A protein has these predicted regions:
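Fe-S-dependent hydro-lyases/dehydratases of central metabolism
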Residues: 1-205
């Protein structure tokens, strides 16, 4: 119907508000935020819902970090995930030469949610999703000593320029163990070209 120009009606989704406070500690990433969400909400029971992130903690997250979180909304089973369009968004678009496209979008002070989840970014610890479900969340500290045979860094969750610069710093001057395979997939050609220009790509490969 929509392709023919007719209205397409759907049920208004339930809205889960996620209030973020504080700031991420060193070595804690946006991936840990969405893994915490999976620990709280699981992968079941969220169909027909959307997630809206708000709160002072949002201002501390870059656009690539927000993209990591919203991309993994699929693992939650939600219809969509949204962040406000704020000054951080404008700075990102300016850097891409698209500043004229920026529009401020944010929830009003009287916004209401069907459920509110609160996450203190300052208290988050490093997390991992273990087999065989994205909501089988474990603390990294509790996985010490686990044998690793394959490492994949990339997809929509670990492939930004910042992510791969951290990887390059960790791998510089080191060698992958003979019984471990490592694959890296930059999130875009732009990221790949930036890594090549600054020499970080050589540290990775």
């Amino acid at each position: 119907l929509a392709m023919a120009g007719e209205p397409f009606r759907m049920a208004f989704p339930k809205i889960i508000g996620v209030e973020l406070t504080g700031r991420l500690s060193n070595w804690i990433s946006a991936k840990d935020i969405i893994l915490k969400m999976l620990e709280i909400l699981s992968t079941k029971g969220n169909v027909g819902c959307m997630v809206e992130y708000f709160g002072e903690g949002v201002e501390t997250l870059t656009v690539p970090q927000r993209a990591t979180i919203t991309n993994m909304g699929a693992e939650l089973g939600v219809t969509c995930s949204v962040f406000p369009s704020d000054d951080m968004t404008r700075a990102f678009l300016d850097a891409q030469g698209r500043g004229a496209d920026w529009v401020r979008l944010e929830a009003g002070p009287d916004a209401e949610y069907d459920r509110v989840v609160k996450i203190d970014l300052s208290s988050l610890e490093a997390l991992a999703a273990c087999p065989s479900s994205p909501d089988n969340i474990k603390s990294i500290a509790g996985l010490e000593g686990t044998k690793v045979g394959q490492v994949i860094i990339g997809s929509c969750t670990n492939s930004s320029y910042r992510d791969l610069m951290i990887v390059a710093g960790m791998l510089k001057g080191r060698k992958i163990a003979d019984d471990v395979t490592l694959a890296i997939a930059p999130g875009s050609r732009q990221v790949l070209e930036m890594l090549a220009r600054n020499g970080a790509l050589a540290d990775i490969i």
